[in-house]
Amino acid sequence: MSARPGLLARAEARLTREWQRRGALAWALAPFACAFGAIAALRRAAYARGWKARVDCGVPVVVVGNVTVGGTGKTPTVIALVDALRAAGFTPGVVSRGYGAKIAAPTAVTAASPPQQAGDEPLLIARRTLAPVWVCPDRVAAVRALKVAHPEVDVVVSDDGLQHYRLARAVEIVVFDHRLGGNGFLLPAGPLREPLSRRRDATLVNDPYSRALPPWPDTFALSLAPGDAWHLDRPSRRKPLAQFAGERVLAAAGIGAPERFFATLRAAGVAPATRALPDHYAFATNPFVDDHFDAILITEKDAVKLGTSWRDARIWVVPVEAALDPRLIALVVEKLRGRTSA
């Protein structure tokens, strides 16, 4: 296996660690963070004061995003929110930028879409929810195209896009993991895209260590729990994680916060060797061909990039389910219904 994926992952991990403290590197980059913050504040002000117009696409939009760099659990949150909205009587659709997707115009994503076209997260959302999913770097164009193709959709969930201010939205949900805002600095000195004080309608904190929630308004715990693993070659074959306990197991993840996946497996009684791959790793070739393990556990997000041509009988996929606080669902539904009746 090439050393490049490992080097990239280690570089990402080191930068993430640096962003958790105010060390020499953070202070050296602080002037650039000030410049970044000024530009970001000017962009926000341009839309807040009407210098630039927000676009209302004729359907309420719920944005699920973050103010930090890296994975926080947005994708399972979007999947759970789509299911909750459907249960509440809505007909939801989803839009996404489609990170890594090779598209310039609005494109529909179905369960059969190639990951190179759709992007890994939109493809996973389409497969898990069976809701209409459209991707485009221009989210306004994506919402409009979705609405034309599916006029029955009465609410759109935007997977990320918090900083896509041009798109008018009815509800904003910001997702954090246990690191919260790190050292509190903006990019590149810290992990923040926007200040922690940024206005939003609700905050979710995905903290597997079950610490006290920060004292922010309308803040709720986000719980992610693994399900039974399914076999990559034979998806109908299921195996509880506890049954991997006596095997030689490698856990590999090409996601924004791979350590969270590894911690989930350890909590389930699995003691794997671990390999962090770069976020959105393409899996152009099998990186496990020279590894000697009984089983290899990967995430669902990575699994969508492994097509039927993969024939590695050791690979199992670990699904993750998000449990949303009923109070969050009630808050979102109330805002949506209030907007509809207004």
From Swiss-Prot:
Presence of the UniProt keyword Manganese in the record: no
Listed under GO biological process in this entry are:
lipid A biosynthetic process; lipopolysaccharide core region biosynthetic process
- What EC number(s) does this enzyme carry? 2.7.1.130
Q: Give the keywords, sorted.
A: ATP-binding, Kinase, Lipid A biosynthesis, Lipid biosynthesis, Lipid metabolism, Nucleotide-binding, Transferase
**Cellular-component GO terms for this entry:** plasma membrane
- Which GO terms fall under molecular function for this chain's record? ATP binding; tetraacyldisaccharide 4'-kinase activity
Q: Which reaction does it catalyse?
A: a lipid A disaccharide + ATP = a lipid IVA + ADP + H(+)
User: Which residues are recorded as binding ATP?
Assistant: 68-75
Question: What InterPro entries does the database record attribute to this sequence?
Answer: LpxK, P-loop_NTPase
Q: Describe which pathway this protein belongs to, using the record's wording.
A: Glycolipid biosynthesis; lipid IV(A) biosynthesis; lipid IV(A) from (3R)-3-hydroxytetradecanoyl-[acyl-carrier-protein] and UDP-N-acetyl-alpha-D-glucosamine: step 6/6
Belongs to which family? Answer: Belongs to the LpxK family.
Q: What does this protein do?
A: Transfers the gamma-phosphate of ATP to the 4'-position of a tetraacyldisaccharide 1-phosphate intermediate (termed DS-1-P) to form tetraacyldisaccharide 1,4'-bis-phosphate (lipid IVA).
Q: Which HAMAP family match?
A: LpxK
The name under which this protein is listed is Tetraacyldisaccharide 4'-kinase
- Organism for this UniProt entry: Burkholderia pseudomallei (strain 1710b)
